[in-house]
Structure formats: structure tokens, C-alpha cells
Amino acid sequence: MALKSYKPTTPGQRGLVLIDRSELWKGRPVKSLTEGLTKKGGRNNTGRITARRRGGGAKRLYRIVDFKRTKFDVSATVERIEYDPNRTAFIALVRYEDGEQNYILAPQRLGVGDKVVASKKADIKPGNAMPFSGLPIGTIVHNIELKPGKGGQIARAAGTYAQFVGRDGGYAQIRLSSGELRLVRQECMATVGAVSNPDNSNQNLGKAGRVRHMGKRPSVRGVAMNPIDHPHGGGEGRTSGGRTPVTPWGKDTKGRRTRDKNKASQKLIIRSRHAKKKGR
């Protein structure tokens, strides 16, 4: 999809750059593949804010997307490509030969009328899903499982992908777009191609109101607060905060590592995404 820029006939259109969605389905989603979505506003079960800067936004229906692709050896035809407000990527409605319908993540270069299939070994075409044991080395993939049968977890956002770079015993080596090189079991499923909507990161929403429609609230700087609210707060006049940048709870921010070094999956990471910063 291309980008649309606007002649600024109103202040909210100045600098506005949006995704051109003219080729997407303009109707409502399939009712049987949707469910209600309750807004949490960043609160947990006790009503306390656990995720700041969330709240409001337009009402949404959740589209049930098939991340597992477990309907093997049954061909499906793409009926339409749809917008999904719950993710940055587009989704494709597919109808299987037995009449069942499903939503899947739409990869780039997948069009209406195309055939897709999930199998132990299938053609290397966008939208086809198979385990790494059936993929040739060098393939660009998305929607990658970390555990067999759990459903895709890696490379699901707009424009993302990973490259299958090698085999190591019962594992497949994949290079992620972050630069990380990691192992996953060869039985894990992956879908051929890169995720649709690669221009998503080039959007400019133009005004604060459009961001509010997406359910995001303002991000207030600590130095603009009072001392009771933030370690950087207070002071006479404008101050720099007076210390290294910290979170509202006094922990170092801007670069501090938060991943547990003893995490079980650490041994599956061959090369860290931070390696390029360390000059390795």
C-alpha cells in the first residue's frame, strides 16, 4: 500500500501522512470470527494503573486471527484483505475447500484470489505455512512459533520478517530484523513472506487527536511534575532533573537491561540484538 499526503486545508492536515487503504475491504468483518473487546485503560484486576499512557480510543471488535495454521493439506482461497484496528498489519480472510473461513496475517504480495496452504512441505509462496523442516535455507518468513503448536509469536507486526539462515541439529537458525540470531525447534511453524503494510512506520498522524483515537494518552515528562510524583520533579524554574534519568519508581532508564540473564531461553540466543552496540 502507498502513502497518502494531504494539502493542508485545515491545521490537522498539515504534515499528515496516512496509509492508502483504498484497496482494502470496506465492509464489516465476519461476525463469527469476531468477539467483543473490553477496554482496560491500562488497569489490572485491582483497578490500579499498571501500563501508563493508555485509555480512551475508538471502540473495537477483536478479529480472531489464526496464528497456529494447523489445518494441514487443505487449500484455501483469499477472499479479501481487511484492515484490523488491533494490529499494525493487515489481515486476510481465507475460505478453505471445506467451506471453513479464517483470518490469517496478510503477507506482502498476497492478493485476492490467491491460494494458500499449510503443510509439512509446500510451495515457497507468500502465505503458505510449514515447519522449518520443510523450508529451504534463506527463506524470508513471518509468524514464527517459539514452541511447536503454540502459535506464531515472532515477526507479526507490519513489515516485519525473519530469515531462515541454517540448521543446527534439531533446531533452525533464524535472523530477526533486530539483528538477533536465535534457535527454534525445526517442528515450529512459520509462514512464507514478510508481513504486509511495510509503510506503517512512515505514517505521520498530524495531530494529537488521532493518537488519542488509537487509545494512547499523553506522555508527561518527569521534570514537569512535582517531587511527590517523580524523582525528577520540583525545583525552582526549569531544571534538568538533577540526576541520571530514572523511572517514576527511581530505577535507571534509557538503556538499562531488563532481561533475566538466567532465563531458560537465553541459551537459544546465539547472537544478541545488542551485539552491534558492543562492536562484536
Swiss-Prot record:
Segments traversing the membrane: none
GO MF assignments: rRNA binding; structural constituent of ribosome; transferase activity
Pfam families reported for this sequence: Ribosomal_L2, Ribosomal_L2_C
Residue span of region Disordered: 221-280
Function: One of the primary rRNA binding proteins. Required for association of the 30S and 50S subunits to form the 70S ribosome, for tRNA binding and peptide bond formation. It has been suggested to have peptidyltransferase activity; this is somewhat controversial. Makes several contacts with the 16S rRNA in the 70S ribosome.
NCBIfam families per the UniProt record, alphabetical: rplB_bact
Complex formation: Part of the 50S ribosomal subunit. Forms a bridge to the 30S subunit in the 70S ribosome.
Protein name: Large ribosomal subunit protein uL2
Gene that specifies this protein: rplB
